[in-house]
């Protein structure tokens, strides 16, 4: 088994407290509302939303995938960080055992820097290259931009 790590950084005009509320704490409600073609719905299968919680995300009609399950590893509201592991679903191939994600929002001027790290745990000696994860990164960035646009258009939301 190998582990391949990829890092991304994005910037936003939205400050960390507001962005974290929308992008992490209320994403299960907000994303299906603003991007139903991407995420149809999200549900908690076990847990209370904190570490150890198992969620099932059902993708929308526009997605190539049906669903994924992920386990929340940590939620740190004070430091605007969130980590979860993709543990089941058709986004996991026969070569990938799991994918762990870490996201941290850092204040930058009046906005944020979003730091994201993905750890792909492969089966056997399979190698994951950056181009293999590029499409997923682009979709995630597009979803992030939708959330950012929503917050810009709804200045009273998530304050």
Swiss-Prot record:
Protein family according to the UniProt entry: Belongs to the BetVI family.
Entry-linked InterPro entries: Bet_v_I/MLP, Bet_v_I_allergen, Plant_def-hormone_signal, START-like_dom_sf
Record's keyword annotation contains Kinase: no
Any single GO BP term: defense response
Organism: Malus domestica
An example molecular function term from Gene Ontology annotations: signaling receptor activity
SUPFAM superfamilies in UniProt: Bet v1-like
Protein name: Major allergen Mal d 1
Lineage, opening ranks: Eukaryota, Viridiplantae, Streptophyta, Embryophyta, Tracheophyta
Pfam family, one: Bet_v_1
């Amino acid at each position: 088994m190998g582990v391949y790590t990829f890092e991304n950084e994005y910037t936003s005009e939205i400050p960390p407290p507001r962005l974290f509320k929308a992008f992490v704490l209320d994403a299960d409600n907000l994303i299906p509302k603003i991007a139903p073609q991407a995420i149809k719905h999200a549900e908690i299968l076990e847990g209370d939303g904190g570490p150890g919680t198992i969620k099932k995300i059902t993708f929308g009609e526009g997605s190539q995938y049906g669903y994924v399950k992920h386990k929340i590893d940590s939620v740190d509201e004070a430091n605007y960080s969130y980590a979860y592991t993709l543990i089941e679903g058709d986004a996991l191939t026969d070569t990938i055992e799991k994918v762990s994600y870490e996201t941290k929002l850092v204040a930058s001027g009046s906005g944020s820097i979003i730091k994201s790290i993905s750890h792909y745990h492969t089966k056997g000696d399979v190698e994951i290259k950056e181009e293999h994860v590029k499409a997923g990164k682009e979709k995630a960035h597009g979803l992030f931009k939708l959330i950012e646009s929503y917050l810009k258009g709804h200045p009273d939301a998530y304050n």
